[in-house]
């Protein structure tokens, strides 16, 4: 009953208007407001400020700056193995496994297609058919910068407008096609093992999604926007390099080509991850 009410409320709340309202409070520099928000958040989620590059909460300009705080250089070591695919974020695995044809498993009986998720053409979708996927949920208490699972050259980024349902486990199990329905950006990289997709999915009260190459991407428009990247503007990122950030929390979805990687045996649904740890092993070399 409680879960049904939670889902019902999400269906009637104006997602974007509510998120903009929360976004205003998160961006305000009014001292007492931002201090109240930050202090309450640290206490509610037991945030470890000792690992933050700036450990003093009072030194953040606003709640957003605190939320996407940088960590000390040694806080998240990047797996050094040459064949390591690493976690792009702190979070928990929602689902991972093989892509069934062009279908990606969400939860229970819910699936969505590669084309729906990426808003791409058949040619790109076919490159991920039968491949591997992982969905990583970033809770409010997690570090909210997203990093590269492997080194790559950015070739394309799609902005896809949509809803802003919560992406917590309750909603994931009850809203069909959730990750292909919410507002998101899909970044496609060329790697040594073929294409790799990193999708940053927006959610309720996520005021914006940012990338390191184009800054704030959302909220953008009501239309799909496709950007292609090539010379002279080449954007190359190494394994573990930051690629974007959420203001506030959400989900990252990873896609890999068929046969490119093998998930570590101890990585499964509900596994807690830290950015930079090895989650899969590269199976093919260019």
Swiss-Prot record:
GO CC list: plasma membrane
Main location: membrane
Membrane topology qualifier: Peripheral membrane protein
InterPro entries in the cross-refs: PS_Dcarbxylase, PSD-B, PSD_type1_pro
Keyword Cytoplasm: no
Cofactor requirement: pyruvate
Co-factor binding details: Binds 1 pyruvoyl group covalently per subunit.
Modified residues (Pyruvic acid (Ser)): 250
Pathway: Phospholipid metabolism; phosphatidylethanolamine biosynthesis; phosphatidylethanolamine from CDP-diacylglycerol: step 2/2
EC number(s) on file: 4.1.1.65
Presence of keyword Ligase: no
UniProt protein name: Phosphatidylserine decarboxylase proenzyme
Organism: Saccharophagus degradans (strain 2-40 / ATCC 43961 / DSM 17024)
The encoding gene: psd
């Amino acid at each position: 009953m409680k879960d049904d009410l939670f889902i019902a409320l999400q269906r009637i709340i104006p997602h974007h208007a509510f998120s903009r309202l929360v976004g205003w409070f998160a961006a305000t520099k009014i001292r007492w407001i931002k201090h109240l928000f930050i202090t309450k958040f640290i206490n509610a989620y037991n945030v470890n400020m000792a690992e933050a590059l700036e450990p003093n909460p009072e030194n953040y300009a606003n709640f957003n700056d605190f939320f996407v705080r940088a960590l000390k250089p040694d806080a998240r070591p990047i797996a050094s193995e040459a064949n390591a695919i690493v976690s792009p974020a702190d979070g928990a695995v929602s689902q991972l496994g093989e892509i069934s044809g062009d279908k990606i498993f969400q939860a229970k009986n819910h699936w969505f297609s590669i084309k729906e998720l990426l808003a791409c053409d058949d040619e790109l979708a076919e490159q991920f058919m039968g491949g591997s996927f992982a969905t990583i949920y970033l809770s409010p208490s997690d570090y909210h910068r997203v990093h590269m699972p492997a080194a790559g050259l950015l070739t394309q980024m799609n902005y896809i407008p949509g809803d802003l349902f919560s992406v917590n486990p309750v909603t994931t199990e009850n809203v069909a096609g959730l990750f292909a329905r919410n507002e998101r950006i899909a970044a496609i990289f060329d790697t040594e093992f073929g294409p790799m997709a990193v999708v940053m999915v927006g959610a309720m009260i996520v005021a914006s999604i940012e990338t390191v190459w184009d800054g704030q991407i959302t909220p953008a428009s009501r239309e799909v926007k496709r950007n292609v990247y090539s010379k002279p503007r080449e954007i190359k990122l190494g394994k573990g390099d930051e690629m974007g950030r959420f203001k506030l929390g959400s989900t990252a979805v990873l896609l890999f080509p068929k046969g490119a990687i093998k998930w570590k045996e101890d990585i499964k649904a509900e596994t807690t991850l830290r950015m930079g740890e090895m989650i899969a092993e590269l199976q093919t070399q260019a």
